[in-house]
Amino acid sequence: MKTLLLTLVVVTIVCLDLGYTRTCLISPSSTPQTCPQGQDICFLKAQCDKFCSIRGPVIEQGCVATCPQFRSNYRSLLCCTTDNCNH
């Protein structure tokens, strides 16, 4: 009986671990959302366009499979791998 109970506990833990997905803040509202499967990296990107001096940088947050390449019009780029780390 103890062996059966221990087996059920182990199977439950393994199944829960397999189903884990990342949560990241998603723009424009910065609310936490579950990322699609395979997108385990949170990112925060601040980029400038021709109106940057008036309204400030455009902020984008979300989930990605790989960190975006840094570009010259970016003010900053953050990629991280813990829940809701892209604030």
Curated annotation (Swiss-Prot):
Keyword Disulfide bond belongs to the record: yes
Tissue: Expressed by the venom gland.
Single annotated GO MF: toxin activity
Gene3D superfamilies the UniProt entry points to: CD59
Cysteine disulfide links: C24-C42, C35-C63, C48-C52, C67-C79, C80-C85
Family (UniProt): Belongs to the three-finger toxin family. Long-chain subfamily. Kappa-neurotoxin sub-subfamily.
Oligomeric and partner information: Homo- and heterodimer; non-covalently linked.
Official protein name in the record: Kappa 1a-bungarotoxin
